[in-house]
Swiss-Prot record:
EC class of the enzyme, as a word: isomerase
Modified residues (N6-(pyridoxal phosphate)lysine): K279
Species of the source: Salinispora tropica (strain ATCC BAA-916 / DSM 44818 / JCM 13857 / NBRC 105044 / CNB-440)
Protein's recorded name: Glutamate-1-semialdehyde 2,1-aminomutase
Family classification: Belongs to the class-III pyridoxal-phosphate-dependent aminotransferase family. HemL subfamily.
Length: 448
């Protein structure tokens, strides 16, 4: 392994011999030692922590260390880890069989729960957010008879070929321009524009409107760090798309059922045509969905000509975990998530300000990021201009003090309803030293 993190007081990654041994073993048999790139710690240096269990707000690694979890499996774990209701739902479902390749009552119940919460008339269950957005794009093309798609730089919609152009998430984390293996033909129908720039959208529609099938946007960007839409951006996107005969696809894989009972739509509604969901709706298991008006969804096979399928779609275990989670996700739970996120954000901001570290706290509901910059952040270019070395120092100081943050400056922080006073006290205790570490690096860095 190559340690790319600079040595220095309070900044060097703590030794983690059990995780190091597991990572060495994994690197021999798994590309990069991980099954999703951001987990490898390449953006922050050091060895990824191998997690052996979670309970409530806590993660426990292979070396026996305990961390307050501010990643929450990248969003899904709104109840915390191993919630008794979810564990019991999984135990009961598994006892009846794990997969049948046939319809089940559970998938009907989960679909009904989504339709009750979200602005969709019909929904199709799939296994991942990538499948959901990929299928929504195919459906939009089939419905409109058009080919071209508008997306926004820094917005991540999964790793399907057509949507990896100028993507956020791991692509931003690793500093990749785009992905080799994506052919010009696959990406050729994708138009990439700056986020929050309606004038750019209007200009493209003026030039190429009859070719554009859909605009796809994250409901609030969460994969370049958290950047909320400005000036009614989503509503204005819908108006421009509809005026030109195109659809608007809103990707709520991250925000859906996390920031409110109805997802981002509950905070900032817009007249989108198709919506995608994931993460929370699976309760920590692989599950996602896309949905919209019945008129559009009826174009899907077996009733329509647009083909989409999946062996494990609507898996009974995933449906059981998702239902157990959503049935506990009431307004009181969302108030708790909002309050907890506000406290954590305030504590982080106060510590960084006291240490003299330039920063911007950017939020979308209870999702938030800390950008290490004093400039306004409103799109991918401004998000990318932050002081990444300062984040690295901050990350490792927090990790050493028992707080697990996303190992990337370009990801959202997430809270769970399980975060209690003890967890908040641990976060508060960790922040001053982490802010000091960031200040030390920031003072001698020109950015990255």
């Amino acid at each position: 392994m190559t340690d790319v993190f600079p040595a220095g007081p309070g900044r060097y990654p703590a030794a983690a011999p059990a995780s190091e041994a597991l990572f060495d073993r994994a690197c021999a048999i798994v590309p990069g030692g991980v099954n999703s790139p951001v987990r490898a710690f390449r953006a922050v240096g050091g060895t990824p922590r191998f997690i052996v269990r979670g309970e409530g707000p806590w993660l426990y690694d292979a070396d026996g260390r305990r961390y307050v979890d501010l990643v929450c499996s990248w969003g899904p774990m709104i109840l915390g880890h191993a919630h008794p209701a979810v564990v019991e739902a999984l135990r009961s479902a598994a006892a009846l069989g794990t997969s049948f390749g046939a319809p089940t009552p559970g998938e009907v119940e989960l679909a009904a729960e989504i339709v009750d919460r979200a602005p969709v008339e019909q929904v199709r269950l799939v296994n991942s957010g990538t499948e959901a957005t990929m299928s929504a794009i195919r459906l939009a093309r089939g419905y409109t008879g058009r080919t071209r798609i508008i997306k926004f730089a820094g917005c991540y919609h999964g790793h399907s070929d057509a949507l990896l152009a100028a993507a956020g998430s791991g692509v931003a984390t690793l500093g990749l321009p785009d992905s080799p293996g994506v052919t010009g033909a696959a990406a050729g129908d994708t138009i990439v524009l700056p986020y929050n720039d309606l004038a750019a959208v209007e200009a493209v529609f003026a030039a190429e409107g009859p070719q554009i099938a859909a605009v796809i946007t994250e409901s609030a960007a969460g994969n370049m760090g958290v950047v909320a839409p400005r000036d009614n951006f989503n509503q204005r996107l819908a108006a421009v798309a509809h005026a030109n005969g195109a659809l608007l696809i809103v990707d709520e894989v991250m925000t859906g059922f996390r920031v409110s009972r109805a997802g981002w739509h509950g905070l900032d509604p817009c007249a989108a045509d198709l919506w995608t969901y994931g993460k929370v709706m699976g309760g920590g298991l692989p599950a996602a969905a896309f949905g919209g008006r019945a008129e559009i969804m009826s174009q899907l096979a077996p009733v329509g000509p647009v083909y989409q399928a999946g062996t494990l779609s609507g898996n009974p275990l995933a449906c059981a975990a998702g239902l157990a989670t959503l049935r506990l996700a009431d307004d009181a739970l969302y108030r708790r998530l909002d309050e907890t996120a506000a406290v954590v954000g305030r504590l982080a901001g106060e510590a960084l300000a006291a240490a003299g570290v330039p920063h911007r706290l950017s939020s979308a509901g209870n999702m938030f990021s800390v950008f290490f910059t004093d400039a306004d952040v409103f799109d991918y270019a401004t998000a990318s201009a932050q002081q990444v070395p300062a984040f690295k120092a901050f990350f490792h100081a927090m990790l050493a003090a028992g707080v697990y943050l996303p190992p990337s400056a370009f990801e959202s922080w997430f809270v769970s309803a399980a975060i209690d006073d003890a967890a908040l006290e641990q976060i508060a205790a960790a922040l001053p030293a982490a802010a000091a570490a960031a200040a030390e690096v920031h003072g001698g860095s020109d950015g990255e």
